Amino acid sequence: LDANRIYFLAADIESFETLRFELDDYLGSYNTDPLFAVFNRYRDRVIERIDYALGRLNQPFDFSANETYPFDRAEAPWAIDGAALDDLWRRRVKNDYLILKLEGKPHEEIVGTLRDRYQQQKRRILQISNQDVFQTILNAYMSAIEPHTGYFSPRATENFKIRMSLSLEGIGAVLQSQNEFTVVQRVVPGGPAEVEGSLRAGDRIVGVGQGDGDPVVDVIGWRLDDVVDL
């Protein structure tokens, strides 16, 4: 749920430890309530962080400070408290702002873009269905046993068929979600993306437009099926 360790606190992870040896028992008895409780905690933490990010947009940033924001936090320690997460997210929002500033965008446009992005992420976490949560639970469980095995909910199965059709016959690239980004998994030989030449495996898709002169929609934090629908 939190591969980059930017939402959960160390205390949250400690409280989940009891599930480490009980997960199979819960699934075997068809009792997923404790597992859904983990997701509910995750959703609460995500909303807390997004609300903080939205509030931080109303405050100035000090770009003279010598500090960094690490994108890959998979091996980082969990934040000890809310203050530690606040500092991490202050730098995260500052980095998001700086990226757009370096593109030459004015302050008002930057704040508007980031506000829309964060609000979109909040809407999406609130739209996650029970089917989505159950799929996440089963996939986490099965990946620990057999990494090449996965579970698709009925909705995910239908979306997968749509994605494969649109991605292969449309731009000619297979896409996947990695954290908040849509990433090109591979470019289909002979497809439009390979012929055009600018798209490569591993590229992150941060915006989608329909052609020259059309506005580019910021898709950071979007669900993969919604990105494909554009």
PLM region spans:
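PDZ domains, with a preference for the canonical peptide-binding region formed by the helix
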Residues: 207-230
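Interdomain regulatory linker/hinge segments that flank or connect interaction modules
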Residues: 109-166, 226-228
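PDZ/PDZ-like domain segments forming the peptide/carboxylate-binding groove
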Residues: 40, 44-51, 62-92, 164-214
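Soluble non-cytosolic domains of exported or imported proteins
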Residues: 33-36, 40, 105-112, 127-136, ...
